[in-house]
Structure formats: C-alpha cells, structure tokens
C-alpha cells in the first residue's frame, strides 16, 4: 500500500525557501534567462541606446568636428601592444609552422616560431633571447617594424578566418618583460676563453643609429674589446630617438638597447661629427682603426626648389627639423632637459609626402595643437608608400588625405604661410605621371611640413668620407652583398648605404641578409673576416655569429639522480616521440638530457599497432591545431624487435656518452622473461631501466602492463627479480588508474626499485559521436577500447601522484611525466618532489626543439628566484599593472566611470585636462635600464627545488563583461551585483564566501583579487536554523600523508 504524503508543514505562512527573496530577485534582474519570445525594439530606440555602450569611435561628420583630443598626448597608440593575457592568447593561437614563412620574410631572420613558442610557455626570457640573438634592437623593431609587409604578410593563418598572428606585438611584449628584468648582456664564456690578439684591434663606427648599434653589438659578441661609436648629437639612438615619435617608440626603449651594447664593452662618444674638423676616415685609420663602419643615415632633407627661402618663422618645416624638435620636447630622458616646449601648431597643417615619415609628421602635428592636418601626395592611395600600420594610424586620428596633388606654389602673407596651391596629377596611357596645369587646388593652411625624403650632400661630410668612392647620387658606393665600400677596411649600412628603408633593415645591414637562394654576408661578419684575415685566420663565408648571452645562460640545471648525471632534467618519455633509434638520436642533437626508448619486449611478445590510434582530445573543446590540452591513444608498445633496440642503445651511448639512455621494457609476469630482458638491456649500455607496469590498454590481454601494475604484490615481486639481476638503477612506471598510487610506489621501493616513474596515461573514453560510435574506431566493425589520455589535462593527476609519493617516501627518486609542457610546469613537478621530467604530448603538439625553450626557461626561473628585487614577480611574469588593452591607465580610481559610452567621453575630457598640465619630459612613469643590474645573491640549483578572504573587483581594469556576476548567481552565492547603466559589478562582502569562482572565470588577470575581509566574519546562511551549530575550525592543517588535522574552537567566532 502506497504511503500517504505528509501534508502537515510547520512552515505554513512563512516565505518559500525554494524561491529567491525580493532582494535576490532584484540582484538577478540582469542575469541571463531563457528567452521565450522574439525581441521587438524600435530601431530609433536602438540607435539612441547604442551610444551608451560604444567603445569605438563614432563615425560620420560628428566624429571629427571640434578640437583634436590628442594635444600633448604622447601615450602609446599601437594596436599591436599586448598585456600578458593578450600575449599568451595570441601566442597560443600561433601554429609554429615548419619552415616558417614568417621567418623567411623577416630581414633579420628572427626565429619567430621559437620565440612565440617560448611566449606561449611563459618563458619571456627565452623569447627575448631568441629575438635579441638575431636582432640587437628587438624591442625597437617589435614596436615599429612594418610587419604587415614582412613576417605578418607571410603568416599561414592569413589563410584562415581569424587572420595572421600579431608578431610585432608578441616581440614587443617579450623584450619589454626582459627589459623589466634588468639583466645585463655578457660575452659568452666560450668567446671569452678564445680571444686572441686580433680581438684587441680598434673598430670605429660613425653614427649611433640602428645600423651602428647592431653592428657594434655583434662585433662585441664576437669578442672584440675596443669598439667605439661616434655620434654627432648630444644624445644617442639616431633616427630611433630623433625622428620616430614617442607614441610609437619611447626613448627608454632606445636607452635599454644601447645599455645592452655597453654591457659588452661598446663605447659611445657624443658630439663627434664626421667632418674635416673632427672625424675623417683617414684620421681614424692613422689613429689605429682596423675597420670602420659608417652608419650616419641621410642627415639632410630633400627640399623642392619651390620652398627655397621659407623658414620655420614662416611656418615651414621639413621632417628633419620638425620631428627632432617634437622628440626633444616629448621624449623623457633623451636630452636631459626638464621641460622643453613643443613646436606650436595652432590651426591647419599640410604635410607633403606619402611615406612613413609623412605619417609621423601628421600625427605629431595633432599632438602639437593642430586643429586639422591634411596629407597631400602626388599619386593615389594605391601607390602610397607608407606601410598600412602608419596609414591606418593617421586615418584613425582623423588626418585628411589629398591624393593626386603636386605642390606648385606657397602663398605667404605678412611673413606667414596662408595657403598652398596644388596641380592635380594624372597618369597617361603609357603609365607616365604628369601635372595638369589646368586643375588647381588651393588649400588654406598655417603650416607646411615637407616630408619628401632625405639625402647626403653636405660637402664637409662628403670630403670626410674620402678615399671612399661615391655613386652618381652622391652617396657611398657599397657592395650590397658584403656592405663593403671601395676601401676594404670601410663598411657602410643603413640609409647611407642606399638599401635599408626601415629600422629593421638597418639593423640587418649590421648583420646578415637572407636571400632566396643564398646567404649574403654583410657588415659585422665581413668586418670580422677582414680583421681575422689580417692575423692569418681564414673564416668561411657562412656567418657564425654568437647568440645573445646573459648570466642566466650560465645557470647550472644539471641533475644527479641515483648517481647518474643528467645535463638537464628534460627527457622524452617512452612514447611516439621515441618510436625509433633515429628519432632518439635527433632528440639528443636538439638538446634533450635523456630519452626513454619506446617500450620493447622479448620477440615472443611482439605486437602490431592498430590505426587510427592517437586522436585529439576533447578537453579543450573545438580547438584545432597545436596546443591541444590532451590526446587519447590506444598505442601499444614498440613493434620493433628486441635486438633492434639493444643495438640502438649501443649506438646512442657510443655517439652521445654524456646523454642518458633509459631502456623502457615490458614482460609478462614471468621471472625468466624479466631477467632476460633486463640483463640484455643493461649489457647493451642502458643507464637506467624503466619497467612499464602501467600501459592502460592493449597489453592487459597478454598479462602485461597494467595487468601487473595494479597489484602491489606483483610489482614488489617483479622489482625483486630485476634487482637481483642488474646493477643499474631501475624505475617501475606507476599507473594513475588505481585508488592509491602510494601503495604501488611503496611496494616498488620494498622490492628494491631505485625510484618510480609517475605516472602513465589515464584510462579514458574521449569521443562519442552523434551516431553512438566512439572515436577512434578500428576497421569496418568500428571496434574501440578505453584509451590512455595524456597531456596537460592529466597534469593535476600526475602532480598529485608525484607529491603524494614524495611525501610518503621521503627522498625516493621520481621520474615525473604527465602534462609537462613548459619550464614553469616542469618546475612545479620538481617542487612537488620529482627528480627529472619526461615529456611526450608537448612534443606531439610541436617538435623536438621545445627543449631549448624548457632549458632557457628553467634557467631563468632559477635565476630570477634568487633576485630580491623581483620578489613580487610570479616566475617570469611581472606584477600585473592596471591597464586597458595592454596600455597603462592614465586616470585610476575613477569610480562609476567605465570605458564606454558617455562615461568614456567624460574620461577623455579629464584625461585631456591632465595631459595639458603634465610635464612631457617627466621620467617617473618610464623604466630605464640601470646598472648594476638585477643582483642575485645565490642562484638555486635544480636539486635545491626538488622538494579566510573575499573578492574585490578593480574597476580600472574591468571590461564589464559580467562573467563574475553570472557565475556567482548560478554557481555561487549571489554576492555580486551588476549595475544596469555602468555595467560595473560590485561584491557584497557580507554575502561573499571567498570561493574564488569569480576570480577563476574573469578574463582579465588580477582584475579580481582575493583580499582579507574587512568586517567580522558571519556564520553561513543555513536556510533553516539547525538544532546544533557545530564549532568552526580555527586551524586547518594537513600532514605529510595528506590527512587533515582539525583543531576546533568548540563554537562560533
């Protein structure tokens, strides 16, 4: 008989417990709800409302009317600038292609794939090292290089919907983080120890611009100790300092790169000119210079005869006197001035020219007070010379463009320019351009800036260049394949050599240029060859330039485990990356410290793998390409014979005696088999054995792998068999597919194992298709089995296994594996108790070369951990500064003023007011290189490391997405409100339990922080008052075995 429901309710008349209270309903007003009807809002209302939410500029006439908002605003304008969050997301998107076309399009041949790999692994030092090795001005070029015409233009992701990678922004970010580390450059130990008399030869470089700084840096890395750069100005940096505006290239960046050159012994003398009265080539040679590099650029403007007689007083500038004047007044630290006025630009400005310099002049004029700027040029938009980045910047800042216009006359009244007249230009059927005198345009203006290029024509400079031959244009005659002049001891690069058009190409003229068919050697290498030849040392034509080097690269990351010395703790796991002997050899050649062979057995247990067997994991959602969070495999052990692997071990140990070979072996549960295979492997020369007792699929049917590894008794007995027959260390491989991995590890130790490997893959069923079939599916019958999941998805499981074994068996060696994909994640395993690190899925995601990133990353982490001045850093990540879109916030702490709609307009007005009152030459907000550099008392070794709150939201960084609000509503405690007008979330402290869900889902790192509660802690909302209120734990402790120890206060506090 069915019992009758109890209808008596003691809470009759009270509010429903299963329904939100009115205050919570009010809080939930903006929380998403399932929509049951179609929306219908009049377009007129939407048109009006959208202005309340806009984050971009208004379009149409109203957007450009009124005074410029840019006066005195020299803040970073680059769209490519990234925060750490943006850099990581962009780097993770990169495909890291084979034979990367982006690198082929870079004049300095940066290893772009490698440095982006390092960024995605949070190894910013490794990325900066890769960049600065090929380009000593890597930060400068990251900021101003026209990447759309170079590396970005060749990015394979141009063929995808999401578009090319922001390579320049990533380069800028990595180098900027290294700049903040404040670590000096040094000459490598190898070079220092191999210096000879030739390295004491004098080398002179004229002009302290990009080409000279680059050339001098490479020569210093080659070991030369007497290198001097002569600069005619009182400040250094050449065009980078004088002619590229602060909002594109801050002076502290130039200062940083020059400091790196000085670190390796480059000397710089300012106020030294190339002229008969001071420096000439003949004088330098007579004073002992063995080689000279000329990098003076083109110092004089090309001026149309139309403008002869016009001066600044009339309102006429050239780019060569305008941009330096702007720089002197807006670049803190450049000339040591405390305050210098900007050139006054009240009214209308016309800029003549269509190159990058013209765009810089135009956008600078807006910051000097111009109300309107027009850029006039002879041809149409399709023939414009400026790179797209510069063109778009000028367009966004509301510069006007006047194409097909050639200046014919400037009208002056009362000593001031009042207008400029243009002839329209036309192109005939033969493609020839001409001016149409019948079509005239008159443009009223107050200032004219000529940006028609530059040249070298000053007689005193040309005479100082003798005996070098000049070309028909008056420049230096240079062999473009060697950068050598008519005088064998004189070299030239940059603008003065007539080839380079950009900073990155000037940098390259100081190093080497890759042609499609062969390498062209130029200045630094050829100067090195020339000097060495004088001393009887013949060098090949292929450049061999040393890489960028710092004290970080001297950190020792070797490890001693069980008496075996590992060069570094990174090795390849027994997995697809070690399928064959040649693959193991290539791994050693790339720098891996050790390898494990693919697991092999006796010939009687040979297997044949099925196909398909390794598939993309579903743990990362619809993510295709690299950076998969997991793989699922039903891979079996090696298909190759036992003798094949024994011979490979012999060859590998013979040719790579300092590398460690670990033989991964597997047998059925049979004493004779284990003894035979173990002794053969030891005799072949294996340094260590790994006993595969944990393969989760395919081998259990034969009584191998997991069939043995889940029983402590069987593991212990197998270990005893192996211990009795071999002297080398051996490590049973643990399975995570068990209740307590510590029991198996304890059994292995008791059986005489030297240590354990933790862990193998996690048994899983990854994909189930809509038709009910699993993937992978084998053959026509579509058979499958539970496979092994690997990759970062299993890292928490593997980390727990390593930590629990290390806590249970103090000092017991552990080879860790399972989701190790960077130096940072590897260091985490080492700190949890691992001795060395095995890698598999990360190589499947990329290639063998990731080991270089891991090694440099680990060295940097160890080095920086010893620096007291960087104690606020998290590994290689600097403290998160308040920012929007990667740029610092000028006005902080403005409550109820988000960055959209009318609030944005109000913020811009306040910012303009603050900028108008600010001193542009104040250095307080810039990070200049300082020496001595970051000091480290003691660098830890790898072996050294082997062993209540509420939320607060930072409205300066918040992007108003409401993710915190939604997750707190539907997965938490309804402790966050969300303003309907400002879209600003607010945490109600009394309701916040400190669960950190909001912190976990926030897309902006450190926008939400967990801080100590200000008010007294209140008891949880019990819903219905309990009959007994248990005591609140005062202290929560965990013992070494992971058991919780409670010390109760006996009552509420």
Swiss-Prot record:
[4Fe-4S] cluster 4 binds at residues 992, 995, 998, 1002. Pathway: Amino-acid biosynthesis; beta-alanine biosynthesis. The keyword Cell cycle does not apply. Gene3D superfamilies: 3.30.70.20, Aldolase class I (3.20.20.70), Alpha-helical ferredoxin (1.10.1060.10), FAD/NAD(P)-binding domain (3.50.50.60). Its EC number is 1.3.1.2. Its cofactor is [4Fe-4S] cluster; FAD; FMN. Residues 84-115, 949-981, 983-1013 form the 4Fe-4S ferredoxin-type domain. InterPro entries: 4Fe4S_Fe-S-bd (IPR017896), 4Fe4S_Fe_S_CS (IPR017900), Aldolase_TIM (IPR013785), Dihydroorotate_DH_cat (IPR005720), DPD_II (IPR028261), FAD/NAD-bd_sf (IPR036188), FAD/NAD-binding_dom (IPR023753), Helical_ferredxn (IPR009051). [4Fe-4S] cluster 1 binds at residues 94, 97, 102, 155. It is an enzyme of class 1 (oxidoreductase). FMN binds at residues 574, 598-599, 733, 791, 817-819, 840-841. Binds 4 [4Fe-4S] clusters. Contains approximately 16 iron atoms per subunit. It holds the Pfam family Fer4_21. NADP(+) binds at residues 354-357, 378-379, 385, 451-453, 495-501. PROSITE patterns: 4FE4S_FER_1, 4FE4S_FER_2. [4Fe-4S] cluster 3 binds at residues 958, 961, 964, 968. [4Fe-4S] cluster 2 binds at residues 106, 145, 151, 171. Belongs to the dihydropyrimidine dehydrogenase family. This is Probable dihydropyrimidine dehydrogenase [NADP(+)].
